[in-house]
């Protein structure tokens, strides 16, 4: 793909979205002052970030659970490197929740004190690939891919926002002992959502009543989120970032195994070979179909 410099800003080997980030912010990320009770949602793009923002917003904010406060999830758990709404992060009340796509080596040094918590959400990369393909076709701030085949090559070359998927997840996993981090699988959460919410609450040391857990589970389903203007990003993508067509949405399907409808057998097998070569020493569990055990 041509003109990638129009969309990507590369800093220390990592691709940021060029129009949403300022170089002075990027250069000072590692020196940003972290609070002991900060929480970071870390993901590779298209891996369940918005879902996790909604889950943590529901866990932490009673006004979000009982719908008495009309605050968007992007303002409750803003993107650390992409301050789209120009919030003053230093004045945010504790505990602060941040979302981020950055790799382990660019995060604030204070996260290595192991007091602030990191929730790393990961998703099977074939579904990430297909979700990213559709998202790039929708959003004006991303290069518009021609075909799944051409985008698959771009994705596997790491010439996308977020850089190479393998480097991102492997880097975080191999350096997990440097941080207070928990890895969560998008697919596991889909299979047993309530248990996953309880696991997240335990990691965050956040006690909720059974009734509150029920409220989190009920409101963080994909269908409920899609209908919730606080969480569906519709206003943000259409009015603030811009789309190529009116039909698309930020929250598209959120299903497991959608890749089967888009990748040919040959593409899938080529992807598998690259996956196994890169991930053979990473014991994280991956689910490629929702019917898998």
Curated annotation (Swiss-Prot):
One of its GO terms (molecular function) is amine sulfotransferase activity. GO terms for cellular component: cytoplasm. Its EC number is 2.8.2.3. 3'-phosphoadenylyl sulfate binds at residues 46-51, 123, 131, 220-225, 252-254. It is found in: Cytoplasm. It is an enzyme of class 2 (transferase). InterPro entries: P-loop_NTPase (IPR027417), Sulfotransferase_dom (IPR000863). GO terms for biological process: sulfation. The keyword Plastid does not apply. It catalyses: a primary amine + 3'-phosphoadenylyl sulfate = a sulfamate + adenosine 3',5'-bisphosphate + 2 H(+). This is Amine sulfotransferase. The gene is Sult3a1.
